[in-house]
Amino acid sequence: MACCCYSTILTHTRLDFKTMHQNALNNATLNVLGHKKNGSSSIQELIEMDEEEAEMNQNVVCIGPNETAVSVELGDEYEKFNIITSLKKDNLFSKDGLLYAYYELCQEKFEKCLKEDDEEWIELWDLESRTWDLIQRLYSFRLSEQQGHIQSHAFSSRAVLEEEYYSQNPEAFENNIVFNWARDNSSDPPSIEIRGNRWFYTREDIKMKNRGGSRFSSNISGTIVSNLDPDADIRDDKRLDERDDNFERQFFHTAFCLFRSGSFEELLELCRRTGNHWRSASLQGILEYRDNLIDDVLQSETSGNKRKELLRRSCLALTKNKRIDSYERALYGALCGDLNSVLDVCTTWEDAMWAYYNSMTQYNLDVYLSSKAPQTETQLPPVDSGLGLTPELIFNSLSNSSIASIQEEASHPLIKLQTHIICNKISEILSSAHIQLEAIRTGNAPESGDLVTPPLLRILTHIILFLKISGLAVDEYTSDSIIQAYIELLASAKKVNLVPLYIQYLSNQVQYEAYSRFLILVDEESARSEQLQLAKKYSLDINHAALLAVEYVYDEVVSVSPEEVHTVYLKSIEEPVEPSYKKLICTLEWLLITSQTDELLRFANLVYRFFLSIGELNSAYDLYTHIPSDALNTLSSSDGEPENDSKFRDAYELMNYRALCRALKFYQEWEELSKQEVFEDSAVTKASTSYKVWKKKLNFASRKCVKSFTDLLQANWLHPSTLELKPDDDPLLYKTLMTIRNLYVPELILGLHNVYFSLEDYDSCFALANEVASEDLKLYHCLIKSGRLVEYVSYLGKAGECSLSTPNGLFSL
């Protein structure tokens, strides 16, 4: 399964918001900064006005960067791995430790899939459980303190020499660990019907043949053995009765599987129960000789075979006999360390890998024992099938096996992971996963995405965590890449509560960058509250991350400078907000949640400037609804020290933007009411209830518009001088404020004129014109700069024409 880009659908139900009160900025032209020390500033008045407005709700949906919604479903194992890691990270190798808990969880999943007969997941969980078992075994040795070496003497038994060999050779000890791991992870042996009487049918055939007939076999000839010696069939080159021959094949298949799985006692018991007592005795000859009288540190009795190498040579000779069953040859081959005879019956990667390791470990041990206890005259050379074998060569041979099933299994990502763990080259497979992730991130499909599927990302991430907890070196660039991909995966599946645990394992260079980009994806109120608690639990600086998140999204979205005024198209408040702007607003709320008031003021103003400069009135209004006025409450209690000047300036600028959004919302509501066709139904007259209700609403909307527009104009809305800002103080900011002012003051003038005109209040239209033309506020400059002076003059002309017909007009007589 190839890995996809983990973009997510971000659905967020916004908080209630408050709009500003109808009371306008009557006193806004007063120098706000100059009145702070009097204890009651215009800022406080603006906040109080804001809190009187009715509450409203709005649902917002944001989607991923490509405007696509991608959902990833993950099982409960992701939560369980998270919990296990959190609880057991200080206890790695014990029976109640981290790695064993991983292993047990995988075993539980494996058993469940067996019941559900889910073949794909049966294989995955089986391989994963084996992987954690392998890590537990290998790393408990690699990270353990080296104990004192076992020392032998001239008369030590071969069993002691074997222990000495492993105690002095860490590489050999690791190979033996892997061999035991492969042995313990074998498949269950096939079942077999137990017969207590060996060669029963052949025995009866021989009896009947000697008596001159047989009721058990209809075809007695000289091809059947004539006696029941254990090696009669081989020695005489004759066969058994077909039924006994079939049973022998089943027996050797089961016997080999029992030896393969390390069930040596069960193998001996099988021999005894099937009448193969001689075979049980001969198999015990494979045990190394141990003498408790010489090896006084050992408590066991004398046991084993002094001439084990002779038995193994006999076994090797039997592997060359093609007349005997392949599983019998494989059993003898496994006993002596021969490779080819065992490989002949191996059809799985695990079995073939065990065969290689069996041959390699036996050969290396034999070479050591021969060097420690040479018997020049009688010593037989070791079986050399394992000569030159190393783990790397073994896995390379398996990858290029002539058996298709073995070669296919060798390419499985979890088996590749196991081979890298065994060869202590975990960094290489982590690097391969990183390369695949980079290909996906850059839009190039990797040749293989097998290492970055959700299950593999989970496994690799927790291996990285284990390595870091263990104090082992991990390439930071590679590990960061994989952990970040896993974080993206969890976020895609809405498992955001799991993410903070993994954030803390990122390197210092990217930790808060990743944390901040993750916070961008967390948009639900409950999830954000939970993130605050998790940040405290894992000692993460969520304030810093939230600020970085806002900076990232702002830099991403605000990529162009404001256009010239005459090229700007003002969007309606009701138009849908672009997803990228939604994301910016949603991210800005993190500063509110983390109570970073100063930064909230700064960035809210930056975002307002951007939106209003490019005509995104709908986006500006959306921002207005998501940053409530009570976010500024801390300002009302601030002292009047000079260092707070910039804070009050930011707050006053923000209140200007909020007042504009509120006023234009009033105007939009007024327009909707004024366009309603209340007289379409002839039954609706001026005396009707419907008309009266509509008229009342319209008059109220008109009053709100007049009040709010008038207050904004009289307050010299957003003029830099009201912020005590001069052109030389900050030329770019000064220019930006003037650009926005020149864009929206004409909207206020024309909108207010329209309301007066609809009310047939022509005197107010002309009074407004006088204010516009006044040199006090120089509002006419905004009309000139915006190129809308001619438009306004034409409106006045219409008002003049209509005023002539009024009772007080020129032609009223």
UniProtKB/Swiss-Prot annotation:
GO terms (molecular function) for this protein are:
structural constituent of nuclear pore
Task: Please verify whether the record's keywords include Cell wall biogenesis/degradation.
Answer: no
Cellular component terms (Gene Ontology): cytosol; mitotic nuclear bridge midzone membrane domain; nuclear membrane; nuclear periphery; nuclear pore; nuclear pore outer ring; nucleus
Q: Source organism's superkingdom? A: Eukaryota
Look up keyword Transport and say if it applies: yes
Q: Where in the cell is it found?
A: Cytoplasm; Nucleus membrane; Nucleus, Nuclear pore complex
The Gene Ontology biological process annotation of the record reads:
mRNA export from nucleus; poly(A)+ mRNA export from nucleus; post-transcriptional tethering of RNA polymerase II gene DNA at nuclear periphery; protein import into nucleus; ribosomal subunit export from nucleus
What is this protein for, i.e. what is its function? Functions as a component of the nuclear pore complex (NPC). NPC components, collectively referred to as nucleoporins (NUPs), can play the role of both NPC structural components and of docking or interaction partners for transiently associated nuclear transport factors. Active directional transport is assured by both, a Phe-Gly (FG) repeat affinity gradient for these transport factors across the NPC and a transport cofactor concentration gradient across the nuclear envelope.
Q: Tell me, how does this one assemble?
A: Component of the npc107-120 complex which consists of nup85, nup107, nup120, nup131, nup132 and seh1. Interacts with nup120, nup131 and nup132.
Protein name per Swiss-Prot or TrEMBL: Nucleoporin nup107
Organism name: Schizosaccharomyces pombe (strain 972 / ATCC 24843)
